[in-house]
From Swiss-Prot:
Bilayer topology annotation: Peripheral membrane protein
Protein's job: Part of the ABC transporter complex PhnCDE involved in phosphonates import. Responsible for energy coupling to the transport system.
Record-listed ATP binding positions: G35, P36, S37, G38, A39, G40, K41, S42
Record InterPro entries: AAA+_ATPase, ABC_transporter-like_ATP-bd, ABC_transporter-like_CS, ABC_transpr_PhnC, MetN_ABC_transporter-like, P-loop_NTPase
Example of a GO cellular component annotation carried by this entry: plasma membrane
The species this protein was found in: Wolinella succinogenes (strain ATCC 29543 / DSM 1740 / CCUG 13145 / JCM 31913 / LMG 7466 / NCTC 11488 / FDC 602W) (Vibrio succinogenes)
Cell compartment(s), UniProt: Cell inner membrane
The protein's name: Phosphonates import ATP-binding protein PhnC
ABC transporter domain mapped to chain residues: 2-246
UniProt main location, coarse: membrane
EC numbers, comma separated: 7.3.2.2
Amino acid sequence: MLKIENLTKRYKGDEIALKGVSLEIKKGQVVGLIGPSGAGKSTLIRCINRLIEPSSGEVWLEGVNLPSLSRTKLKEARREMGMIFQEYALIERLSVMENVLSGRLGYHSFWRTFWRRFPEAEVERAFYYLERVGLIEHYNKRADQLSGGQRQRVGIARALAQEPKVLLVDEPTASLDPKTSRQVMRLLLELCREKELLAIVNIHDVPLAQAFMERIVGLRAGEVVFDGAPSELDERALTEIYGEEEWKTLQKTHQEESSLGEDSSLLYAKAEIAG
């Protein structure tokens, strides 16, 4: 279980990015974070694994309060937390396989990783995850030769190669077209179910979140203003999360995408799941 208690992040100049956020997420649960730009979604994800240091509050993972850990202990704890980034965060000049194996860096000494001497079992595991994400034939290709969707799949394989208990996913579809976005979300959900992973997914596309997430948390100005099932995310709740004007703009954007044949609606995503 992941338990977040009264988590707050203040920046210089008294800017408050998170205001007393409290959440409990069970093993195997996939939670979507939605909200307007600047709501604190990415900050929350990064405060959990301390890529950003929280100002106050607690983050408990398997009985350990992460903000209280020393750097050495934090490195060990981060083995349990896989991260998937919006901009992929791949090393462009390295091969797909080398990027996936970089997910094991937290388990080995500097020199072993420098010379890329990974145990055979870890190489086999990397091949397994490349097969699961549909990139086994590209294992020796440089990362900069891949499409956006393929790069995100490498990022997923790398995170899973850690054998984590938690997946922290920051805008995995922001740079992808609607069809590829649905494919990536479907893959993420399948792998989380297969591994019983707890996952938090920061996602900008509301219909996509409604289709794929089992629980949705809405943030506005650093505070939780909605926490419930996708079926409870009605017009009133969405207006509370985004504000009336921004929600109208988002609705218009989704309608325009649909009219162009790039529909990212709930029906299409559900069809993708069922298919």
